[in-house]
A protein has these predicted regions:
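N-terminal pre-ligand scaffold of iron-sulfur
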Residues: 1-41, 59, 72-92
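Mid-chain, well-packed structural core segment of small domains
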Residues: 37-63, 67-70
């Protein structure tokens, strides 16, 4: 996985089984960089409170683990991308 900036937007690019996906690099819970998390298959786990996102869609898989609280969390934006030769182009 790799963190890039496109027109001021922080993007996380992940390779899942040879396919590339792009989502926001900011956790929708507390804004932590997802690129500092752990990618297991297509599931990205944020290091902040262990919220999990599907990098292929940006959908929330597991809510943050915060004792006695039920924090609001949204899906993170996902972006279309195209691979040409050795370049990856992200459409915002």
């Amino acid at each position: 996985m790799k963190e890039v900036e496109v027109e001021g937007t922080q993007i996380l690019i992940a390779n899942v089984n040879g396919n590339y996906y792009a989502i926001s690099n900011k956790c929708s819970h507390m804004g932590n960089p997802l690129s500092q998390g752990v990618l297991d298959g297509n599931i990205m786990t944020c290091t902040g409170h262990n919220a999990q996102f599907d990098v292929t869609t940006g959908k929330v898989v597991t809510r943050p683990k915060v004792a006695f609280l039920h924090p609001k969390i949204k899906d993170v934006p996902s972006y279309q991308l195209k691979v040409e030769d050795e370049n990856i182009m992200v459409k915002l």
